[in-house]
């Protein structure tokens, strides 16, 4: 069984440790909120605990240079099943080349919406 310990003191810094009982070892993770993701997560009611659970147990998809962590109903571990409605359908988007959280939200059709996105993020330039 995994034990997750939230070590973050700064609202823009998400630090947590995962202790694996079988291995008797811990791994430390560090993610950084952008000002946008911090603002949106507080507006959408996605707190740090929900973000940590989605990052640890969610399915990961790489598209458009971003990592999408989707925590579906079946991904929630047994010891959190009594809080299933609190955690399910949480999506955390992380930059593909760093540990920066771009945004987070909740969506019932998250996997479908991510699959429909194009492979690359299109950037339009304003030409004079």
Task: Label each PLM-derived region with a short phrase.
Residues 1-128:
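Ribonuclease/tRNase effector modules and their secretory precursors
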